[in-house]
């Protein structure tokens, strides 16, 4: 192996890792210098170690130190030493670091409350970390500071005013609490209906003034709640602490509107059938003798104003609209009445027995002598009536004296009718015409000798006869007319 020239000069930087030979002993002028350098490093490391006598208490650290005679330990020996600080101490005391943080119940709806935090004392804490959760009140009823409730209301009023939300509404701080007074509840549909009514009456200023009045009241109430004085604060707290009134189910609650009437009917009174709006009306219907779910509404479809008892109740004489949703006084199942819900007044049971009809029924047949079934008469019978006068108004017109001659649907009129009615029926003269109607024969009468189910033999063509006499029809030559009766064979 070649001798390292740099080692002989005393400046080989590879040391024992050099791939050339470094001669020992007297060879080379740089060998003694290298050995003396190693001895100097060992002495300096020993002196450095003697500066820290406390390290001798940890004999296990010697395992991390290499022998002094090993020249390999001269590089990076200081980085391999493991020194444990003498002032390190393990604490067995648990410290509640969460005590300095605010608990979950320390915040209100819109503000926060100060929380008194206890500093860590270094002793084991006996405080339950979840005590704040168990003692938290989920509702605002348990708050001792009433100022938070008032602050919440004030902020809600500011948000309501600045957000542009619907102002004709009520306000409640909690859904379990009752509404705060001073606000009215009207939907856009109700205002639109009132505008249509006022426009039809030719008085749109009435609607405009009412809406402006409601808007001014709303703004005034908002300002009072945004900047409440002591009297208003006291009134609010008393109102919130007072028990909620019992709520009646359905639409039985009363509400005073700006248009001067009740918005919805109560259980004892019902609005008339003039309009369904905010108008004031002094006429109300009598209390029903027997309540009925189908007869609770007195609103007429065409604006007529009935005053009558329900349809399934006692017999009370009343004048109702001929076709409306007003309660009629006829009983559907056997009791007597004076007027029908569809314009027919009858003294008979709905589906049985003979009847003496005292007014024109719904389809123009009036009878006083002939027994009638539930549908006005038998098939093919003739109905003769005398001179009767009806007070039932027509659906589309006023009463006119019209002599009518008519028949049943499946019958044939054999005599002229001399019935004079003050109005026509639903199928009568709809536009106040005063004419004499001719007798109309039914679709199927006893005088009709032709049978539409068969075709006479002399009316069939030769091709049709050939097809009917054959065992099966030929494609494209199937007859259109029915066959004659003698061509049918029952097998």
UniProtKB/Swiss-Prot annotation:
Its main location: nucleus. Residues 23-82, 92-111 are annotated as: Disordered. Residues 33-64 have a biased composition (Polar residues). It is found in: Nucleus, Nuclear pore complex; Nucleus membrane. PANTHER family: NUCLEOPORIN NUP42, NUCLEOPORIN-LIKE PROTEIN 2. The FG repeats are interaction sites for karyopherins (importins, exportins) and form probably an affinity gradient, guiding the transport proteins unidirectionally with their cargo through the NPC. Probable component of the nuclear pore complex (NPC). This is Nucleoporin NUP42. It comes from Xenopus laevis.
């Amino acid at each position: 192996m070649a001798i390292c020239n740099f080692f002989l000069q005393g400046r080989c930087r590879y040391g024992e890792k050099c791939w050339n030979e470094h001669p020992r002993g007297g060879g080379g002028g740089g060998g003694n210098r290298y050995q003396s350098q190693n001895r100097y490093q060992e002495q300096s490391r020993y002196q450095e170690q003697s500066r820290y006598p406390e390290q001798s208490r940890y004999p296990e650290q010697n395992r991390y130190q290499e022998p002094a005679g090993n020249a390999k330990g001269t590089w990076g020996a200081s980085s391999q030493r493991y020194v444990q600080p003498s002032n390190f101490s393990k604490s067995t005391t648990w410290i509640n670091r969460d005590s300095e943080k605010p608990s979950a119940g320390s915040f209100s709806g819109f503000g926060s409350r100060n929380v008194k935090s206890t500093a860590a004392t270094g002793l084991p804490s006996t405080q339950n970390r979840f005590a704040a959760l168990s003692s938290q009140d989920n509702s605002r009823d348990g708050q001792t500071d009433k100022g938070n409730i008032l602050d919440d209301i004030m902020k809600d009023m500011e948000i309501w005013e600045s957000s542009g939300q619907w102002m004709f509404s009520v306000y409640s701080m909690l859904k379990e609490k009752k509404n705060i007074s001073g606000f009215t509840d009207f939907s856009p549909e109700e205002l639109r209906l009132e505008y249509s009514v006022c426009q039809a009456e030719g008085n749109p200023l009435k609607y405009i003034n009412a809406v402006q009045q409601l808007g001014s009241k709303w703004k005034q109430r908002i300002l009072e709640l945004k900047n409440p004085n002591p009297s208003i604060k006291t009134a609010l707290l008393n109102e919130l602490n007072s028990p909620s009134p019992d709520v009646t189910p359905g639409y039985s609650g009363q509400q005073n509107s700006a248009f001067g009437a009740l918005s919805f009917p109560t259980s004892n009174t019902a609005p008339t059938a003039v309009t369904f709006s905010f108008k004031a009306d002094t006429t109300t219907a009598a209390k029903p003798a027997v309540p009925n779910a189908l007869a609770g509404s007195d609103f007429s479809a065409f604006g007529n104003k009935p005053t009558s008892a329900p349809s399934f109740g006692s017999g009370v004489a009343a004048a109702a609209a001929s076709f409306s949703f007003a309660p009629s006084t006829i009983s559907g199942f056997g009791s007597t009445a004076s007027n029908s819900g569809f314009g027919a007044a009858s003294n008979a049971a709905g589906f049985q027995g003979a009847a003496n009809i005292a007014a024109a029924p719904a389809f123009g047949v009036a009878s006083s002598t002939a027994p009638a079934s539930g549908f006005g008469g038998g098939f093919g019978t003739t109905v003769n009536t005398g001179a009767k006068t009806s007070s039932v108004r027509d659906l589309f017109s006023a009463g006119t004296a019209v002599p009518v001659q008519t028949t049943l649907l499946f019958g044939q009129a054999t005599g002229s009718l001399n019935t004079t009615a003050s109005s026509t029926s639903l199928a009568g003269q709809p536009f106040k015409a005063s004419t004499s109607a001719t007798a109309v024969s039914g679709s199927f009468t006893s005088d009709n000798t032709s049978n539409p189910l068969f075709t006479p033999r002399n009316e069939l063509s030769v091709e049709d006869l050939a097809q009917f006499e054959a065992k099966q029809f030929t494609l494209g030559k199937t007859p259109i007319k029915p066959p004659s009766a003698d061509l049918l064979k029952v097998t």
